[in-house]
């Protein structure tokens, strides 16, 4: 059932949500999910996020790496566990097999393959199920995946760097950055969580952008580069062609 969560549930779920953010944009066609297992004694005994390229699922990893007996434990998961077989085994069945007593879910999975079936299976197996804990925060993480499976459309985000008065550069065009170091790092973090980055040819010509992610530890998670250039005017010396 949907609950008004207590502070304890929120604390564990917030940890799970932070785990889900780790691989956001790098789990292939699968959502990036966070999972935290809490023992009957209220101790965290395992935690995991979805593997790179979407496999294994977070629940499976968390169960396999648990440091104690998980029978009777509570599982906090950011998205409804699946109950269908595909490239990965059904997570709902796995939780029942491990005799988990309670599952707290942040957001229901509207994927037609799931769509409440995981929750129903858990309840039919006498597992206590609570949903809706920090659901709005989970939706920010899951929105790209859910928009694709429900509507067949990608999530598109627009990044604009501007000054307080709405300007993007000096009049003479000599300004290099109007952003600070923190906002530039955030921009690179956004690149690491998206499949593609699109710019017009004028951006390439004026900024000589690389369009990659240059954050330590995330350099291999750069997006596909898409350049709108109907006249094929991109200079062969452009940085974007060297990477």
Where are the predicted features?
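Short beta-strand scaffold segments in enzyme catalytic cores
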Residues: 33-39, 160-161
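Zn2+-dependent cytidine deaminase-like catalytic core
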Residues: 37-138, 224-226
